[in-house]
Swiss-Prot record:
Xref: HAMAP family: BtuC (MF_01004)
Annotated gene: btuC
Role played: Part of the ABC transporter complex BtuCDF involved in vitamin B12 import. Involved in the translocation of the substrate across the membrane.
Gene3D superfamilies with a match to the protein in the record: ABC transporter involved in vitamin B12 uptake, BtuC
Protein name: Vitamin B12 import system permease protein BtuC
One annotated GO molecular function: vitamin transmembrane transporter activity
Major place of residence: membrane
Membrane topology: Multi-pass membrane protein
Length: 326
């Protein structure tokens, strides 16, 4: 038994090391790649100072943090709701952030600064989170809370559809680009949003013990002495914050929160002491690579990153599911 535990521990360490190396390589590629390839030796030249430090670095950091936040949010939701299909958009938090951002665009007639749009997106996500917490205080079961989140997401989606239908052509273009996700407008002015993600990310990565209990199911978690009501509220609030900030930075990005935790579990990373940091590393790597593809796929334009993540990730996910089912 001790030998098996040591083997599993070594395997987990190898996985984390491999994911760390992958993230560093993806980070390096993201800083080098673009309309002009700039190797690390040229980063401190006048050209590198402009393209790398002023344009690519803030975008790369935003992609890294959003990828980590979405993947960790997916892992938390899948444990909290005991559902492998749970992901950040399932509770309606992503759509709530979208409603806040769309309201800001329409009411501000496209004149509001980026920081105001970001605050409105976070406010929309937190409003949906507060509604979910109110449901949770009624001691609803996890399945009922999940259904409540789905219903809120449908309502928010309907509101966004109505807003797009009645918007002007200029607003419509901005809204449609946001709904497909993208980091094209990110620069150092959004650094406050990036900083808002870091404390919550680090805190959740340290909560492996309650997450492991939650993954066993509600009944087992209660028997082990976990204050289920408290942890459900705290984790829903933390997830709402991360998703709201991510939407404010990059818009709606699917796939990452659903597939990354699932892929790591299929690879044997089931302990949340390893799964949570693994999700952060893998989510950041996947979104960095998708962002590079989005930038380089077309010569004269940039692809929406949400389209890239779905196109590249879905076949890999299906292959892993088929492989695991044999």
């Amino acid at each position: 038994m001790l030998t098996l535990a040591r083997q599993q521990q070594r395997q987990n360490i190898r996985w984390l090391l491999c994911l760390s190396v992958l993230m560093l390589l993806a980070l390096l590629l993201s800083l080098c790649a673009g309309e002009q390839w700039i190797s690390p030796g040229d980063w401190f030249s006048p050209r590198g100072e402009l393209f790398v430090w002023q344009i690519r670095l803030p975008r790369t950091l935003a992609v890294l943090l959003v990828g980590a936040a979405l993947a960790i949010s997916g892992a938390v939701m899948q444990a909290l709701f005991e559902n492998p299909l749970a992901e950040p958009g399932l509770l309606g938090v992503s759509n709530g952030a979208g409603v806040g951002l769309i309201a800001a665009v329409l009411l501000g007639q496209g004149q509001l600064p980026n920081w105001a749009l970001g605050l409105c997106a976070i406010a929309g996500a937190l409003i949906i989170t507060l509604i979910l917490l109110r449901f949770a205080r009624r001691h609803l079961s996890t399945s009922r809370l999940l259904l409540a989140g789905v219903a809120l997401g449908i309502i928010c989606s309907a509101l966004m559809t109505w807003a797009i239908y009645f918007s002007t052509s200029v607003d419509l273009r901005q809204l449609m680009y946001w709904m497909m996700g993208g980091f094209g407008g990110v620069d150092w002015r959004q650094s406050w949003l990036m900083l808002a993600l870091i404390p919550v990310l680090l805190w959740i990565c340290c909560q492996s013990r309650p997450m492991n209990m939650l993954a066993l199911g509600e009944i087992s978690a209660r028997q082990l002495g976990l204050p289920l009501w408290f942890w459900r509220n705290v984790l829903v609030a933390a997830t709402g914050w991360m998703v709201g900030v991510s939407v404010a930075l990059a818009g709606a990005i699917g796939f990452i929160g659903l597939v990354i935790p699932h892929i790591l579990r299929l690879c044997g990373l089931t302990d949340h002491r390893v799964l949570l940091p693994g999700c952060a590393l893998a989510g950041a790597s996947a979104l960095l690579l998708a962002d590079v593809v989005a930038r380089l796929a077309l010569a004269a334009a940039e692809l929406p990153i949400g389209v890239v993540t779905a196109t590249l990730g879905a076949p890999v996910f299906i292959w892993l599911l088929l492989k695991a089912g044999r």
